[in-house]
């Protein structure tokens, strides 16, 4: 099959970009004829080995994947809405009406596609600060985002306590995000492992929040975060336990000012992770919403069937600076920024809709005016929204100055009267763990050496480790490998 320029690419200047990408594709191990990465060629049919498929496949955009015209136009509306919320926040920052801005510009296509392939309020989501379009597609509103931008008390993310674009929405199964980028990888794996443990331990199933048996966990990072230790810890655990996690890397080529080839060995995270077992790998043009939707559909289907985690490497662009505390003109040449502008998904997807006869230029212009009016109204409302009362600033905050064991401040239970030999501290901790695990099936123990014998077939013939200091001795024997 010969390589063909995808339909979403505009004419003229963008053609050179696509040609350059195709050269890079072959240099990275892709065959223009076979469209299969060289690391996957030796895999046996049906084997549980990494599968790497090509980006920029023109067939993807020719196939609408069962999406009707209303949905196809809706994709554009959400993408445009996301971009215009970014633009409104930038405007408000210039007017000193908000405190910070970090955009999701250039990432919109893959994010709307991800939401479309998943189930809002059913699956679980651990996004990062670029994921505005994902949150809009899941059901968050522009009004709610602008409440967050101004730090209003009504902000659903954190009631005005978090920075903007730090997503958290209880109704949509989006736990609150940390500013420490990369931690969401561990949080996502933890959520998936809760589902995994519940599937193994019957007593857990009515105690794990949101457990349905086939829920999928989404998490995303930028290319820079793949150099963080949390990322690799999470990926290793997910592959080892075949957890239903979709790892999405939104690769815009920069970690603030650091180019991807400087921060990532070889400049391609897909190559680095291609040897992980049980991992489905898909490399996709993240500026193409239909290609991205096809990739996510495959990933979601695999995870729902509990075949293992999935990895989506989406190549996107960053048309704006990292944030309003950054100026990309200091380190990015004009010609590079112009190349990105030529393949901006807001532009190319609108052209696709018109070229395919799905929407006319007049219809899209009317849609844009409607969105702009919606955002202007939402901004006016947000600016007038009450801020959190200053006296509430310390609510729900841990105090390092108050000793929770101080009998003068808190009532405490009288000490137990012991008889006989109490044993060592290790004995007491071990006994406590046995009692607590008996009482509460939600307690699981994991880590190096905690098992009596990780190869359970030998449990009957060996004494067992049970921790370096024997603190976890016999927990595995009593409660099973699903909990220890």
Pin down the residues of each PLM region.
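A short, conserved beta-to-alpha structural element at the edge of catalytic cores
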Residues: 241-261
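Cofactor-binding active-site loop characterized by glycine-rich and histidine/acidic residues
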Residues: 84-87, 91-241, 259-277
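Long, amphipathic alpha-helical stalk/connector segments used for oligomerization, subunit docking
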Residues: 301-311
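Acidic, glycine-rich active-site loops and adjacent beta-strand->loop/helix elements
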Residues: 129-134, 221-227, 249-255, 287-290, ...
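Conserved thiamine diphosphate
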Residues: 196-199, 206-213, 265-298, 341-368
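Structured core elements
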Residues: 101, 126, 220, 246-248, ...
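Conserved acidic/glycine
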Residues: 1-110, 314, 319-321, 325-479
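Glycine-rich, charged/polar anion/phosphate-binding loops
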Residues: 231-234, 294-301, 430-432
